[in-house]
Structures are given as C-alpha cells and as structure tokens.
Amino acid sequence: MALLLALALAVTGLHGIVTRWPTQPVCRVGTPCSAPAVGAVLVFSRRGHAAVTARAGAGGRYTVRLAAGYYAVSLRPPATIGGVKPREVRVRRGVNGRLDFRIDTGIR
C-alpha cells in the first residue's frame, strides 16, 4: 500500500541548480569560479516546439514538471556565447530526477 501511495505521489520532471561558469578569466584553486544563475530561464523543447520553461530562483534552484521523453534545452533569451549544458535531457516516467545545468559565460 505504501509503495502504491509513493508511486502516486511521484512527480515526473526535473529539479536541480543552474550555475554560470566561469565567472572570471582565470580560475584559481580555492576561489569559486561559478555562481548561481538566479533568474536564468531554461526552455525545454520537444520536436522543435517549446514545451515548458523553468526560471532559476534563489541559489539557482529550479523545478519543472515534464512528461516522460526527450527534450532539447536552451536559454531564453538565447545565449550569444557558450550556451547551456547539457543540451539534451531524458525524463523518465514517474521520476523527479536531479539534473544540474551549467551556463557557459564565454569568459576565457
């Protein structure tokens, strides 16, 4: 019974943290080289059409409900340099998976 209840309460989608990287031209040991991407908007698309968006909140955290399947991931507005990684994700039915995204700032 408990297993059935747990399965019924499972939310299909993703959650995690979005960071910007690098935040400075030279990364040094002991000095953070990334930062939470508060306010970043992730766009999850299927078959070339935007399915849903998620905005990173405090600490770069995001949560998004998605149907099971494969999605392309991009930023809104589109990144002129770098982009977001990973660019493709798979959502499994009945699973609320943890997936962190990194936005490449293009700083070198």
Whereabouts are the PLM-identified features?
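Short, acidic Ser/Thr/Gly-rich low-complexity loop/linker segments typical of extracellular
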Residues: R46-G59
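Short hydrophobic/aromatic-rich beta-strand segments that constitute the beta-sheet cores
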Residues: F44, V64, V73-L75
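A short, solvent-exposed beta-strand micro-motif common in secreted/extracellular proteins
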Residues: G69-A79
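Sec-dependent N-terminal signal peptides
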Residues: A2-L9
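Surface-exposed loops/turns
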Residues: A58, A67-A68, R93
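Glycine-centered loop-to-beta-strand initiation motif
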Residues: G16, A56-V64, F101
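Short, ordered, surface-exposed loop/turn motifs in non-cytosolic proteins
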Residues: L14, R20-R47
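Structured interaction patches on ligand/partner-binding surfaces of diverse proteins
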Residues: P78-G106
